[in-house]
């Protein structure tokens, strides 16, 4: 295979969406128009850095980390107004964010779902109650170390981030179905280990007779 062919090879998850997931969504929801089948529009990765307003090195580290994780240089987020109690002035840097689209979006989603999330210690799945009512989903990560692109020996500070998957779905139900097909590990609603057995009146009546 030539170098050009490799460079233009379709991302694995994008190919899976086109060849399998679209058909599965069509079967599940019965869309009359194929154009209505939901897809992934963009992914926004946001890293808040409160100390950046007073230490430029902190922001440099955040930019370096998010660039390594996403493969795209982030934009700096600045304070919209001054807050005296936090010694924050309007225009000071408070974080950074990237918006991923196209193949880079699909590649990041694939790495996140297949490599990064499984590396989280005691990971039990993502909360499925964090949709915004329009099929978009946001969740937070408390640190950056689960990403293979981060050299743990060079970590200066643990940094969390918020990740938003923006879809073209019209409802939370459709958005959740799409993300599940993409491989999102949502928590099961009922955990057999934690579920309590429901006992009706007959049980307590027998207990009283004893």
Curated annotation (Swiss-Prot):
Residues 195-210 have a biased composition (Basic residues). The keyword Ribosomal protein applies. One of its GO terms (molecular function) is structural constituent of ribosome. Belongs to the universal ribosomal protein uL5 family. This is one of the proteins that bind and probably mediate the attachment of the 5S RNA into the large ribosomal subunit, where it forms part of the central protuberance. In the 70S ribosome it contacts protein S13 of the 30S subunit (bridge B1b), connecting the 2 subunits; this bridge is implicated in subunit movement. Contacts the P site tRNA; the 5S rRNA and some of its associated proteins might help stabilize positioning of ribosome-bound tRNAs. Part of the 50S ribosomal subunit; part of the 5S rRNA/L5/L18/L25 subcomplex. Contacts the 5S rRNA and the P site tRNA. Forms a bridge to the 30S subunit in the 70S ribosome. This is Large ribosomal subunit protein uL5. It comes from Cutibacterium acnes (strain DSM 16379 / KPA171202) (Propionibacterium acnes). The gene is rplE.
């Amino acid at each position: 295979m030539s170098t050009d062919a490799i460079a233009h090879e379709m991302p694995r998850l994008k190919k899976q969406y086109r060849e399998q997931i679209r058909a599965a969504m069509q079967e599940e929801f019965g869309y009359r128009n194929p154009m209505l089948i939901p897809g992934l529009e963009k992914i926004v990765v946001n890293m808040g850095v409160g100390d950046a307003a007073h230490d430029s090195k902190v922001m440099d580290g955040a930019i370096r980390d998010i660039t390594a994780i996403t493969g795209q240089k982030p934009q700096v987020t600045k304070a919209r107004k001054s807050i005296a109690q936090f010694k924050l002035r309007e225009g000071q840097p408070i974080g950074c964010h990237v918006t991923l689209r196209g193949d880079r979006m699909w590649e990041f989603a694939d790495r996140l779902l297949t490599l990064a999330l499984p590396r989280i210690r005691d990971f039990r799945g993502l909360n499925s109650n964090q949709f915004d009512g329009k099929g978009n989903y946001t969740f937070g990560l408390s640190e950056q170390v689960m990403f293979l692109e981060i050299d743990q020996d060079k970590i200066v500070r643990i940094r969390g981030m918020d990740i938003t998957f923006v879809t073209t779905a019209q409802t939370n139900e459709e958005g959740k179905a799409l993300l599940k097909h993409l491989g999102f590990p949502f928590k099961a609603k009922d955990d057999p280990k934690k579920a309590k057995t429901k006992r009706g009146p007959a049980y307590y009546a027998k207990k009283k007779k004893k």
